[in-house]
Amino acid sequence: MTETPPLPMRMVTFAAWRDSAPHAAGAPGRHYVTLAELLVRLGGYGLGLTWKARLPDEQPRVAFARMAKESEGAGIPTLELLAMDAPHLQAIDADFEGYAGDELRLTLREFDSSSWDVRTADAWVLSEIRRHYPDARPMTADEWNATH
């Protein structure tokens, strides 16, 4: 029996800063899409993954260093990651890699605090990202490599 070759990874990018709906005070605002928000958008798909954080040393918050350290080795399950402080904060230039066992399934890249880049072979994940973030556009491999 022949093994099915893995699907190629595809990438999209979208703006990290979003216009918010008016609040009780009536004024619209802007909000930053956090890692926590993205994980919630992935729903059950994300729950089965463990995460490894790749962050530069100069992150402004101690919470990111803690997350990176704890994600070494086997990684952090999604629910444990969501319970930490860092996923609710804005990072600068960070990769969050989601694994199913030893297989990398998804990379969420926070680039320059201005965009999120998503890389996966899973069409459902890309569809969900596009549904929640309609400005998501395809990226080339060269564009992906330039943001690292």
Report each predicted region and the residues it spans.
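Short, extreme N-terminal segment that most often corresponds to the first beta-strand
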Residues: M1-G46
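Hydrophobic, Leu/Ile/Phe/Ala-enriched alpha-helical segments that form helix-helix packing faces
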Residues: L38-L42, D85, I129, Y133
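Short, surface-exposed beta-strand/loop "edge" segments at domain boundaries and coil↔beta transitions
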Residues: A21-R30, Q59, D102-R105, D117, ...
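Acidic, proline/glycine-rich low-complexity IDRs
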Residues: L106-H148
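Surface-exposed, low-hydrophobicity interaction/linker segments
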Residues: K52-R109
